[in-house]
């Protein structure tokens, strides 16, 4: 079933009832204008149809990280697109949001650091959402690009019951713009960028610890 609009650089997740959520991104070529639109479709019945939900209150963004907690949909970070000196630049975000069906959006605790394009849907395990690497914007515009040292490897853990964050070590090969696929009690992290524009053939498995 086609989305109501074209979208790139968005994020999505599947909840416990097999509802597919897609949030934010861009409907235009290049990084020119971001979206705050959110869509959901139930694939547990026939025929599935997309429904538009209230926009993300934090505003338009590209490359956020999404997750599902039971029947709820969560969105973390991403990058807003803003004009500056005749160009469009990224503003790296730390806000976090939860959508509860029938109740709407609520704001969660801000991330300890900005997080853009971390593995998504984010791993959910051990009562937590895990953000593994991604881009925090600290090296945006680094020159020369070939000497870019890579993305931060900090692993962020959002404790669902407490509503709080902690930093829990570093990923051995931090990357951005890649999926996280549940498998064998862990989450497979295939490919992704090790620095802007440079992709990796590496495949790792991330196993969250209690």
PLM regions with names:
Residues 1-210:
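Kelch-like beta-propeller repeat domains
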């Amino acid at each position: 079933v086609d989305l109501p609009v074209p979208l790139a650089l968005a994020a999505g997740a599947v909840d416990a009832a097999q509802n597919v959520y897609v949030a934010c991104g861009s409907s235009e070529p290049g990084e020119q204008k971001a979206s705050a639109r959110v869509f959901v479709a139930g694939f547990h019945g026939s025929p599935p149809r997309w429904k538009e939900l209230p926009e993300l209150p934090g505003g338009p963004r590209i490359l956020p990280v999404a997750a599902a907690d039971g029947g709820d949909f969560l969105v973390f970070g991403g990058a807003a697109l803003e004009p500056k000196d005749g160009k469009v630049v990224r503003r790296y975000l730390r806000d976090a949001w939860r959508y509860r069906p029938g109740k709407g959006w609520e704001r969660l605790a801000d991330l300890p650091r900005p997080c853009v394009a971390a593995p998504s849907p984010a791993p959910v395990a051990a009562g937590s959402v895990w953000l593994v690497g991604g881009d925090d914007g600290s090296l945006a515009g680094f020159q020369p690009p070939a000497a870019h040292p890579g993305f931060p490897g900090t692993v962020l853990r959002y404790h669902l019951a407490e509503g709080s964050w902690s930093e829990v070590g570093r990923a051995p090969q931090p990357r951005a713009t890649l999926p996280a696929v549940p498998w064998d009690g862990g989450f497979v992290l295939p490919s992704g960028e090790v620095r802007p524009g440079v992709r990796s053939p590496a495949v790792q498995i991330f196993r969250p610890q209690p």
